[in-house]
Amino acid sequence: MTVLSDRDIKRALEEGDIVVKPLEEEYLEEALGPASLDLRLGNEFVVFKTLHKPCIDPTVDAGENTERIVIDEDEEFVINPGELVLAVTHEWIEINAPDITGVLHGRSSLGRLGIQAHVEAGYVDPGWRGRLTLELVNFNPMPVKLRPGMRVVQIVFHRLSSPAERTYAESSGKYHGDERPSPSKMHLDFCRG
């Protein structure tokens, strides 16, 4: 696998191999790094309710343990110490080329505030279409304010050694087409008898 440079990313955007919406020209100049593209925080969050249960069971729909919060673009969202919050990118991403994949990395400026931008879901398969769910965790001993539109992650695009035989879109991925932050759908992996 090779990493796409800024030139390669621009070309892939022009040719429709990668789609990022919205992507204003002036923002592209600010967000495009030598080998990555910064993505912004959306305005929708999912928080976990404190329930009087002994644990979370991955075989059960996690959505019942969550609450969805939508804020205005000019509001702020406070993430407390030790809190896990699901959020969504402002941008809609499509990876249309079967030989391109993406990997999310938290921005170091956010990490230096104690915020981890994604816990595990940092891989974006060929054929992905949707907004990316972020798993934000605050490791700072202080609450941290987050604002919609702030750059929170960068996506690094890689070219595969050969095109994927079956893309994420063709494999009926559980999160394909997401527009909102999605709680775990792991319960769908378990067979019920």
Swiss-Prot record:
Question: Could you read off the lineage of the organism from its UniProt record?
Answer: Archaea, Methanobacteriati, Methanobacteriota, Methanomada group, Methanopyri
Keyword Mitochondrion part of the UniProt annotation: no
Stated EC number for the protein is 3.5.4.30
- An example of a Pfam family matching this protein is DCD
SUPFAM superfamilies, per the entry: dUTPase-like
> Record's family?
Belongs to the dCTP deaminase family.
Q: Where is this site: Important for bifunctional activity?
A: 122-123
Region of interest: Disordered: 169-193
**What are the GO BP annotations of this UniProt entry?**
dUMP biosynthetic process; dUTP biosynthetic process; nucleobase-containing small molecule interconversion
Where are the coiled-coil regions?
Answer: none
Tell me the leader sequence span: none
Assembly behavior: Homotrimer.
Per the record, the pathway is: Pyrimidine metabolism; dUMP biosynthesis; dUMP from dCTP: step 1/1
Protein name listed in UniProt? dCTP deaminase, dUMP-forming
Which residue intervals are annotated with compositional bias (Basic and acidic residues) in the record?
Answer: 173-193
